[in-house]
């Protein structure tokens, strides 16, 4: 079944590519990329109490992803990103569970459009907004959140390109079966003010019918020539808590510095904790669970041998502490991003 779906998917790509050869085509294919990454990872566990130190290591293919975008007439655009090597995510191991997004945009005007299909759950923050293939170490929240669900959003962009607002209703990322009747209600703002950019959201997400966990997610980014840094803060809370702020938090800081055209040196640190409830109680937050405390620090570099972003080598290391238990990790990997639409013979 999976092979048949994959062949159908590739046939659709070939069909769209054939249509895109004609400059007057009703359907266009504007972007077609194949992205993949493979890593060698070494974990060292120092040991604690009666547990002896241990080392684990091995090679792993991380991602194999096809992404395509195009237009249908003058009012519609389509967008698809498919993980060919999708893990068992969600409540059903199906080909569609490996679809990050598959949605249509309907442009009412130059400023207003409706988006419908499987799409990113609109939560603020620049770590959350990053392509997973570009994340080497993530927070506990990033590692556990389900990012993609079926739904719809109404979007507004101003003429200057400084503000993008969207309101979204979609399936709750906490669903574990079809037709579960729980939803997420999201309000998102992307701001672009020169060197300063925002990715802010307010979210009400059902984890059971009528029971909500609420997010206020503030993503802040500064971009200068050759330097990019961001600071994300996510506050999670239920209305049933005594204190709404400061009890269940994720904070992330990241910085990357270009060294010429081929090198980037980066550092990242993150911290998750949940003191909103006692452990072993019915959790309001099912991603960073009650009593959890996780922090990590990482440092590394990326090397682009061709001078563009199509081939990347990375080497980085990290220290992670989960509820006081440490782990050290080294990661060496290769990423390549192939533009299939503009390949030359």
Q: Which positions does each model-derived feature cover?
A:
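Outer membrane beta-barrel
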Residues: 23-44, 55-172, 181, 190-192, ...
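Bacterial Sec-dependent N-terminal signal peptides
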Residues: 1-24
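Loop-centered beta-sheet repeat module
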Residues: 165-214
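Outer-membrane beta-barrel pore domains
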Residues: 39-54, 90-92, 107, 127, ...
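Membrane-embedded beta-strand positions in outer-membrane beta-barrel channels/transporters
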Residues: 35, 63-65, 101-103, 151-153, ...
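A structural signal for well-ordered alpha-helical scaffolds and beta->alpha junctions
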Residues: 147-148, 156, 182, 213, ...
């Amino acid at each position: 079944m999976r092979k048949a779906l994959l062949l159908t998917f590739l046939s659709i790509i070939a069909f769209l590519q054939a249509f895109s050869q004609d400059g007057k085509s009703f359907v266009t294919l504007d972007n077609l990329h194949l992205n993949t990454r493979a890593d060698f990872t070494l974990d060292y566990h120092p040991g604690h109490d009666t547990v002896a130190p241990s080392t684990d290591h091995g090679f792993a293919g991380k991602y194999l992803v096809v992404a395509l975008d195009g237009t249908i007439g003058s009012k519609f655009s389509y967008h698809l990103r498919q993980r060919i090597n999708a893990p068992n995510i969600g409540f059903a191991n199906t080909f569609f569970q490996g679809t990050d997004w598959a949605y249509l945009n309907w442009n009412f005007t130059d400023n207003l459009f409706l988006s419908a299909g499987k799409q990113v759950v609109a939560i603020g923050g620049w770590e959350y907004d990053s392509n997973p293939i570009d994340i080497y170490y993530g927070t506990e929240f990033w590692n556990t959140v389900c990012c993609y669900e079926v739904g719809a959003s109404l979007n507004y962009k101003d003429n200057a390109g400084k503000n993008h607002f969207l309101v979204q209703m979609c399936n709750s990322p906490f669903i574990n079966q079809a037709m579960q009747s729980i939803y997420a209600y999201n309000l998102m703002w992307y701001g672009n003010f020169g060197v300063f950019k925002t990715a802010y959201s307010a979210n009400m997400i059902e984890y059971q019918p009528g029971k909500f966990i609420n997010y206020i997610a503030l993503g802040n980014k500064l971009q200068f020539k050759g330097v990019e840094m961001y600071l994300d803060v996510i506050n999670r809370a239920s209305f049933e808590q005594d204190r709404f702020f400061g009890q269940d938090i994720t904070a992330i800081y990241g910085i990357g510095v270009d060294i010429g055209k081929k090198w980037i040196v980066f550092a990242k640190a993150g911290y998750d904790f949940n003191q909103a409830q006692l452990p072993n109680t019915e959790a309001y937050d099912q991603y960073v669970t009650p009593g959890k405390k996780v922090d990590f620090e990482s440092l590394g570099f990326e090397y682009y041998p061709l001078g563009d972003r199509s081939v990347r080598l990375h080497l980085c290391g990290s220290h992670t502490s989960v509820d006081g238990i440490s782990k050290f990790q080294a990661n060496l990997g290769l990423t390549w991003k192939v533009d299939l639409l503009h390949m030359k013979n």
